Structure formats: structure tokens, C-alpha cells
């Protein structure tokens, strides 16, 4: 089992459907009340990319990609067109989009993350697959053009010199979702006009 640092074809993923999934246990009591407990601390995303296939060449590209990943065996990158930036979809990325930590004077590494807030509640999503060339970093709201690097396979930002104590570290970026195929079978249909289709191509988010 390995992770292949290659992205599922963008022209096909653009037409896909899917999104976050949560796992909640709901128990109905004799009184009619409910008890609800979260089984997962974090959400997991599912997608179906069959909707993005529009022509026979798209079908061939998916089959080749599936074979190269050995079905469910190897993970890969996927661009979720509904959520792939550190900012709102209509906005441009800036170096101050997301807070990723606070300097201690000794800590040199910081994990990229994205916050989802509504009301008083916030969920923090760890970003492990930033897109190369899109990451921007700021210290105390001032963009840093040098003095740091980012590992695009882990999402870890490393500073040459540790940010001083109390300095807010922020970042902006595009990112992919680490996924795998959720089936070892592709059910391909080819009609008389040689137009192909696949009923479903499920993808499942994985932890890397």
C-alpha cells in the first residue's frame, strides 16, 4: 500500500458529486428523547466521479488511472472543486487566510490547516496535500517571501528560523484531498456508437 502523488484528471473531477460525511450514533429513548454521539472526531469525504465522464476518451483515462492505482490499493490526489482553497471560492488566496499556529521561539514546523466556522463552533481540518506553488505564508499578517519551505506531501511548513514567541503564523494555499478508489471493479458500458459510461466510480478520503 502506498500513496501516489498524482491527481485524478481535473476535467473529470469537475463533474463529480460528493462531499463530507459524518458518523453519528442516534439512540431513541423510551421517553421519545434522543441521545446522539459522534463516532468520528473528523469528517470523511466521499465522491462519485462517474458523472464527470462525457466522452469515450474520458472513460479511457479513468480506466488507465484505475489500473495504475491497482484499484483500491494505492491512494492519490483529488481536486474537490467545491472546496480546494484556503479562502472562499470567489476569493483569491492570500498569505493571511488561515491561522496555522503561534510562534514559541523554538518551534520551526507548522501543519497547514483550514478552519470551518459557523456561529460559535469551529472545526479544524488538517491539510496534508497542498498544491505545489500555491502556498503563501505570513508572520504577524506580513507575507514572508523567503525563510520557509513546505512539504507538499505532508502539508508541513518549516521555517529556517523559528518564529518568535507570540507571533501568529498564517498561510494561504490550494489543496487536494487524499483519496482511493472505493471499489476494485469498474463496470464499463460501451454502446453501439462507442460512447462509454460507468455506472458509479466511488472515491473515499483516506488519512495520510
Residue ranges and their predicted role:
Residues 1-74, 177-196:
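Solvent-exposed edge beta-strands and adjacent loop segments
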Residues 36-37, 98-99, 158-161:
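Beta-strand-rich interaction surfaces with strong enrichment in secreted/lumenal proteins
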Residues 46, 132-136, 166:
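Exposed beta-strand and adjacent loop surfaces of beta-rich binding modules
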Residues 46-50, 109-111, 168-170, 200-202:
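Beta-strand secondary-structure signal
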Residues 53, 114-117, 158-165, 207:
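Secondary-structure transition/turn motif
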Residues 63-147, 175-208:
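Extended beta-strand solenoid/passenger and fiber regions
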Residues 142-167:
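A surface-exposed beta-strand-loop module
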Residues 160-182:
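Small/polar beta-strand repeat architecture
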